[in-house]
Amino acid sequence: MWFQDVRTLKEGLEFNGITLHLTSCQHGCILSRKELNDYVKKINIQMLKSHWMEKQSNYKYLFFNYIK
């Protein structure tokens, strides 16, 4: 599953004017803005949000706070 390969996003990166806040409990890698853009383009952002919320307990990620 793609969740296993996701690295930590630095808090405050923007995608299409939306600030993404992500906190990881286990990893310290940082995605660049280009990596973030290339990655998020592949999936509907609301679907991504719901998947993170669903999977957070399994993968120790929190993915909250879409701020325009």
From Swiss-Prot:
UniProt-recorded name of the protein: Putative uncharacterized protein DDB_G0275531
Source organism (scientific name): Dictyostelium discoideum
